[in-house]
From Swiss-Prot:
Its main location: cytoplasm. The gene is murB. It comes from the Bacteria. One of its GO terms (molecular function) is FAD binding. PROSITE patterns: FAD_PCMH. PANTHER family: UDP-N-ACETYLENOLPYRUVOYLGLUCOSAMINE REDUCTASE. Residues 13-185 form the FAD-binding PCMH-type domain. Its cofactor is FAD. Cell wall formation. Keywords: Cell cycle, Cell division, Cell shape, Cell wall biogenesis/degradation, Cytoplasm, FAD, Flavoprotein, NADP, Oxidoreductase, Peptidoglycan synthesis. This is UDP-N-acetylenolpyruvoylglucosamine reductase. Pathway: Cell wall biogenesis; peptidoglycan biosynthesis.
Length: 341
């Protein structure tokens, strides 16, 4: 079977796989009609944004729909700014836009790769802020009814790197737009790492934005130079008792207390202290500067990346008794599959 359309330019790992057909959509109406037609035909379909959260382990025996819809509309009331953003907008460019419009609140989420439409699926987050904190609503195409529907943020069932779009709406919904709600009474979020040195009374949104960009640029390789999907593993959440046991054996372990009493561990710290920072397996490697990032060292296949990920998971579990979970979607011949390729 021939797969004439290369996916290499459309996944940030730079994996060389192809697909049967590819369609680019530039309007919401086009996105609706294209996805409904493919869904009703029962042929494999993959809706692709920035390709920054995906690992292709095989050619895709179906149609890839590239979402290139654009548009940002702004409104306000006495207490909030509201942004309605089309799914194909670049996330980081949206953060930049909001700052330039004097609508702060997104600065902690700077330089997260991908599109706005992908952001709610895994409830993107960084430096103490998650999408759920500023999401107002999510509009999506219901593939079964053909209707455009809207969920409030509460209805999206957001959790750490989770949402309803990874649950009961998985493979049944295509996100078309996202609404954001930014308080006019801006409060800096400075709890995490490199932001703690700022003075909450004097810091500006622009300073936070620039610091986040600086830190992410130092730690995360440019996908054009070294293929990657950003953070490959979720930060595992453990009970307070488990954390205390780990801290007794590993006093420098990094953990962040959660509102429910659990503790979120830094997966990068676990990987590094399992001796895997800079480790390579074939053409895939653990990044030498940030152990949370897996990289394509040149001509790596999706299988290479998955094998490395499984090795990292096994080693961290062996050393710490903690099981890591992968963040990116793993795509096989006909759709999403598991890491065990």
């Amino acid at each position: 079977m021939s797969f004439p359309y290369s996916l290499k330019p459309f996944n940030t790992f730079g994996v060389e796989q192809s697909c049967l057909s590819m369609i680019e959509v530039h309007s919401k109406a086009e996105l609706q009609s294209t996805c409904l037609s493919l869904y009703q035909s029962k042929r494999p379909m993959l809706v692709l944004g920035g390709g920054s959260n995906i690992v292709f382990t095989d050619d895709f025996n179906g149609t890839v729909v590239r979402v290139l819809t654009k548009g940002i509309s702004c409104s306000e009331d006495g207490t909030h700014f509201y942004l309605a953003v089309e799914a194909g907008e670049n996330w980081h460019e949206l953060v930049h836009f909001s700052l330039n419009q004097d609508m702060p609140g997104l600065e902690n989420l700077a330089l997260i790769p991908g599109t706005v439409g992908a952001a709610p699926i895994q409830n993107i987050g960084a430096y103490g802020v998650e999408l759920c904190d500023i999401c107002d609503w999510v509009e999506y195409l219901d593939l079964e009814s053909g209707n455009l529907l809207r969920l409030t943020a509460d209805e999206c069932e957001f959790a750490y790197r989770e949402s309803i779009f990874k649950g009961c709406l998985r493979d049944k919904a295509v996100i078309t737009a996202v609404g954001l709600r930014l308080p006019k009474a801006w409060q800096p979020k400075l709890a995490y790492g490199p932001l703690q040195s700022f003075n909450a009374e004097t810091v500006t949104p622009r300073e936070i934005f620039e610091r986040v960009c600086e830190v992410r640029s130092e730690k995360l390789p440019n996908p054009e130079e070294l293929g990657n999907a950003g953070s490959f593993f979720k930060n595992p959440i453990v009970s307070a008792a488990t954390y205390m046991q780990l801290a007794a054996h590993f006093p420098s372990i990094v953990g962040y207390a959660q509102p429910n009493g659990e503790v979120k561990l830094a997966a990068g710290w676990l990987i590094e202290h399992a001796g895997l920072k800079g480790f390579a397996l074939g053409n895939a490697g653990v990044h030498a500067k940030q152990a949370l990032v897996l990289v394509n060292l040149g001509h790596a296949t999706g299988q290479d990346i998955c094998r490395l990920a499984l090795h990292v998971i096994a080693r961290v579990n062996e050393v710490f008794g903690v099981k890591l979970e992968a963040e990116p979607r793993i795509m096989g011949l006909t759709g999403e599959t598991s890491l065990d390729v």
